[in-house]
Regions:
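Class I SAM-dependent methyltransferase SAM/SAH-binding core
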Residues: 48-93
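Short catalytic micro-motifs in class I SAM-dependent methyltransferases
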Residues: 108-109
Length: 160
């Protein structure tokens, strides 16, 4: 609850910090857009919806969730698409049926979780057979700017 309260308080200022790293987000969105084209997407830890808003035109539909009601309020205030739905959810206990989504995205969050394995297991559960789990993470590099990591360490999950 303490972390959730932090993010609720931080929500209105979060976009200021994201704007400072537009280049890193733009590069990430370029990589993600082709992967979500015409697919059902679940974004976990959406924050203010930067990724969800950035891929909405490509995806068939997007469910974007976050544990912080404050973050979701900000994300909803910028939403203008019927394909995009925001809700407050704990990513360790998702209300969706098994195999509900063709793509699950959890960006910049695993290092913040007390139980990352539980969140990954839950993401795999709601992922359709043959689906795609995208878990990008930024790292601070150079002069305090965010830089995308060009390699990925993935935990294998069977979805068949």
């Amino acid at each position: 609850m303490e972390k959730q309260s932090f993010w609720d308080r931080y929500a209105r200022r979060y976009s200021h910090f994201v704007r400072a790293d537009q280049e890193a987000y733009a590069q990430m969105l370029e990589w993600i857009r082709p992967a979500v084209r015409d697919r059902t997407v679940l974004e976990l830890a959406t924050g203010t919806g930067v990724i969800a808003h950035g891929i909405v035109h490509e995806a068939a539909s997007i469910e974007a969730t976050d544990a912080s009601a404050g973050m979701i309020d900000v994300a909803r205030s910028h939403s203008h698409s019927r394909k995009l739905h925001f809700s407050v959810q704990d990513m360790r206990y998702l209300p969706y049926a098994d195999g509900s989504f063709e793509v699950v995205i959890a960006a910049n969050v695993l290092h913040l979780l007390p139980e990352p394995d539980k969140a990954l297991d839950e993401a795999a559960r709601v992922l359709a057979p043959g689906g795609l789990l995208i878990v990008p993470t930024f790292t601070h590099a150079g002069e305090g700017r965010l830089a995308t990591v060009s390699y990925t360490h993935l935990r294998a999950h069977e979805t068949s």
